[in-house]
Swiss-Prot record:
Residues 88-161 form the J domain. Residues 449-511, 549-604 form the SANT domain. This is DnaJ homolog subfamily C member 2. The gene is DNAJC2. Constitutes a myeloid leukemia-associated antigen and might be a target for leukemia T-cell therapy. Component of ribosome-associated complex (RAC), a heterodimer composed of Hsp70/DnaK-type chaperone HSPA14 and Hsp40/DnaJ-type chaperone DNAJC2. Interacts (via ZRF1-UBD region) with ID1. PANTHER family: DNAJ HOMOLOG SUBFAMILY C MEMBER 2. Residues 160-250 are annotated as: ZRF1-UBD. CDD domains: DnaJ, SANT, zuotin_NTD.
Length: 621
């Protein structure tokens, strides 16, 4: 804050009072270029700096207009006003070198200059001949200005600019100089885009994103180009509403067709460029190399993963092998210990048995009678076979530490216990056999008249027939019954129901019954073939080479080899059976021939049984 200095010594302070007139109101009108600029900014809601840029732009346009040089159109005076639609409006106004880039100010200035130069009144004053009305060429200047001053009509004329090059380069033209050929073509066609920021074609150093943006833009090109200027009919000339509608319909169809052709032209241009673009080829090769690298990396990763898995699997197998070996070693050691214990026990039992025999022998088997002594010897052997080690030891201790009478009593007591045990076991076995027989009778009770009389021969024949005609054979049980009726020696006729019932009962047989049936079959075999009596005193026998009969049953593998050999060596083959025998290891020529005959008989029997069943079924029908 600024303060005045105090008064000097000896000086006083003087106070002055002045009288002023009253304030008056006056109205002022704002004028001047500054006020004009302020009003413009306020109306446009723009700042002073923006307005300054606009002013500079207007000044630059004015300077361009001043610098614009019009080109004289030499054919202007020869133009036909009636054919104004086919004239070049830009050339008529002297803007042929500027064309679609000309501004409205330039068009207006060009028209003004052409009017000042070619107006009929001025030419008339100069003594030039003037045509009457619209027949004068000045009408062409007027029409040109009408077309170019109207934005809609100007766009229609620009769409069909006669100087525009609509050609599309071919693939062969751009094979070696792609960018030199296609760059100017895309630049001149970019004038038809509704979007202002048109991407450039670029060069070989352009990135994949830039190239992708470029082709995406042109494949989805949005063109403003339209062909209303080429309408053959003008709807203003129509005499009625229907005629005007018809003209509009025809014009729309023609415009749509021309628009379609234009879009096909653009699409052909883009397709040709894309197919010739060296960058696309480069990108494809890079993408292919990238995929190959990814594929190799993936395969390498997979290989490493498989190697790791295989390594882990081998480690697990090795661990399992070691564990198994350890377990087997433990089992082997345990088995060895058990075997040793068993051997020790066997030796002990053998020792006790021998001790029992010696003790009994010492006492002359407690009898002086030869028959009783032999019987006692049998009973002692029975004790040796049936008694456990502890019982044998206890019995031997008793025999060695007592008198003959006490030992005999102890031995007889032990023999009585063993015999009682054997008797009980035999009774239990007989009871099981009786129960099994009852069950068999119950299960086969409803099998028909023939089910009650089944001999061992019929049972064996049934088993053979069941094996001969396996499951899957047509009318299997009828065929089996027919086979049994043909080959049975009992004369009993069996039905399919009888055969099914007996087959089921055989399947349910107790194991003891099966053994009994097999034993009976073996007894019958011995009875039929006889048994060679054995000499009481066996002497070493001499071996004589003679025919050897092999009763070993044929295995599945031998059967397959035989069938294959029969197919390989037909009937007319020399030494056929010798070659067949060589193809079947372990079988002689005689074995192969015998097996072949058996197979033939089985097939014949099977066919005969099936045919008989088939004939019976036909007879029933």
């Amino acid at each position: 804050m600024l303060l005045l200095p105090s008064a000097a010594d000896g000086r006083g302070t003087a106070i002055t009072h002045a009288l002023t007139s009253a304030s008056t109101l006056c109205q002022v009108e704002p004028v001047g270029r500054w006020f004009e600029a302020f009003v413009k900014r306020r109306n446009r809601n723009a700042s002073a700096s923006f307005q300054e840029l606009e002013d500079k732009k207007e000044l630059s346009e004015e300077s361009e207009d001043e610098e614009l040089q019009l080109e004289e159109f030499p054919m202007l005076k020869t133009l036909d006003p009636k054919d104004w639609k086919n004239q070049d409006h830009y050339a008529v106004l002297g803007l042929g070198h500027v064309r679609y880039k000309a501004t409205q100010r330039q068009i207006k200035a060009a028209h003004k200059a052409m009017v000042l130069k070619h107006h009929p009144d001025k030419r008339k004053a100069a003594g030039e001949p003037i045509k009457e009305g619209d027949n004068d060429y000045f009408t062409c200047i007027t029409k040109a200005y009408e077309m170019l001053s109207d934005p809609v009509k100007r766009r229609a004329f620009n769409s069909v600019d006669p100087t525009f090059d609509n050609s599309v380069p071919s693939k062969s033209e751009a094979k070696d100089n792609f960018f030199e050929v296609f760059t100017p073509v895309f630049e001149r066609n970019s004038r038809w885009s509704n979007k202002k920021n048109v991407p450039k074609l670029g060069d070989m150093n352009s990135s994949f994103e830039d190239v992708d943006i470029f082709y995406s833009f042109w494949y989805n090109f949005d063109s403003w180009r339209e062909f209303s200027y080429l309408d053959e009919e003008e709807k203003e000339k129509a005499e009625c509403r229907d005629e005007r509608r018809w003209i509009e319909k025809q014009n729309r169809a023609t415009r749509a067709q021309r628009k379609k052709e234009e879009m096909n032209r653009i699409r052909t241009l883009v397709d040709n460029a894309y197919s010739c673009d060296p960058r696309i080829k480069k990108f494809k090769e890079e993408e292919k190399a990238k995929k190959e690298a990814e594929k190799k990396a993936k395969a390498e990763a997979k290989r490493k993963e498989q190697e790791a898995k295989e390594k882990q699997r081998q480690a697990e197998l090795e661990a399992a092998r070691l564990a198994k070996e350890k377990e087997e070693e433990e089992v082997r050691q345990q088995a060895l210990l058990a075997k040793k214990e068993k051997d020790i026990q066997k030796k002990a039992i053998k020792k006790e048995r021998q001790k029992l025999r010696n003790s009994c022998k010492t006492w002359n088997h407690f009898s002086d009678n030869e028959a009783e002594r032999v019987k006692m010897m049998e009973e002692v052997e029975k004790l040796c076979d049936r008694l456990e080690l502890a019982s044998l030891q206890c019995l031997n201790e008793t025999l060695t530490s007592c008198t003959k009478e006490v030992g005999k009593a102890a031995l007889e007591k032990q023999i009585e216990e063993i015999n009682e045990q054997i008797r009980k076991e035999k009774e239990e076995a007989e009871a099981r056999m009786r129960q099994a027989s009852k069950n068999t009778e119950k299960s086969t009770g409803g099998g028909g008249n023939g089910s009650k009389n089944w001999s061992e021969d019929d049972l064996q024949l049934l088993i053979k027939a069941v094996n001969l005609f396996p499951a899957g054979t047509n009318s299997r049980w009828e065929v089996i019954a027919n086979y049994m009726n043909i080959h049975s020696s009992s004369g009993v006729k069996r039905t399919a129901k009888d055969v099914i019932g007996k087959a089921k009962s055989l399947q349910k047989l107790d194991p003891h019954q099966k053994d009994d049936i097999n034993k009976k079959a073996f007894d019958k075999f011995k009875k039929e073939h006889g048994v060679v009596p054995q000499a009481d005193n066996a002497t070493p026998s001499e071996r004589f080479e003679g025919p050897y009969t092999d009763f070993t049953p044929w295995t599945t593998e031998e059967q397959k080899l035989l069938e294959q050999a029969l197919k390989t060596y037909p009937v007319n083959t020399p030494e056929r059976w010798e070659k067949i025998a060589e193809a079947v290891p372990g079988r002689t020529k005689k074995d192969c021939m015998k097996r072949y005959k058996e197979l033939v008989e089985m097939v014949k029997a099977k066919k005969a049984a099936q045919e008989q069943v088939l004939n019976a079924s036909r007879a029933k029908k």
